[in-house]
């Protein structure tokens, strides 16, 4: 009994992470010309990330664990995801997404961050970890969300970011994003980034 309680206490001390697999259910998110749907990749990466962070000793939560929306209303769905930050008292909120752009040559993961120092600091660390561990040709920089991304504009004090893992509009990157090996590389980069941020 005591050992279990102690383990949970230690787990909480390591940090609380809320993982948000973007979209879900009736909301598929972006779709590639080959028919790849964003929501499925988001969930696949998020589930792998939860497992990896659990193994690291973090206390982790998911906003969704299956192909479901939190509400049929888009506004309510996003509000419910934001509310989970306060409910879990998370140190880090990371929303997993995939990008899409008319220009097919665009590639590379990019981090968007909420308007606070915790988010900026984590975004810088995470963007560098993605460059180092996933693709050193990726010259993208972390960007402030400003008026974009409602999920980052709720005023939460913890580190809140959206990670666009890559571009479904780039055929080569799309194929990578669908593969378990590449998803594991992304997960590894995120875990390294979280570990570095949580040390500070």
Name each model feature, range by range:
Residues 1-17, 21:
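Boundary/activation segment at the start of structured domains
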Residues 6-12, 36, 40-200:
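Active-site-proximal helix/loop segments of hydrolytic enzymes
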């Amino acid at each position: 009994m005591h050992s279990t309680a102690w383990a949970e206490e230690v787990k909480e001390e390591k940090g609380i992470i809320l993982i948000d697999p973007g979209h879900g259910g009736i909301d598929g998110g972006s779709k590639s010309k080959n028919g790849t749907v964003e929501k499925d990749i988001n969930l696949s990466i998020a589930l792998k990330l939860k497992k990896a962070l659990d193994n690291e000793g973090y206390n982790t939560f998911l906003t969704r664990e299956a192909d479901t929306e939190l509400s049929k209303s888009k506004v309510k769905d996003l509000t419910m995801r934001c509310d989970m930050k306060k409910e879990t008292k998370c140190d880090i909120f990371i929303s997993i997404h995939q990008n899409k752009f008319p220009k097919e040559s665009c590639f590379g993961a990019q981090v968007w961050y909420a308007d606070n120092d915790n988010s900026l600091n984590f975004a810088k660390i995470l963007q560098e970890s993605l460059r180092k561990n996933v693709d050193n040709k990726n010259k993208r920089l972390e960007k402030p969300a400003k008026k974009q991304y409602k999920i980052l504009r709720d005023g939460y004090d913890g580190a809140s970011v959206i990670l666009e893992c890559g571009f479904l509009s780039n055929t080569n990157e799309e194929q990578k994003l669908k593969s378990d090996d590449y998803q594991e590389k992304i997960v590894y980069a995120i875990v390294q980034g979280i570990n570095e941020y949580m040390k500070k």
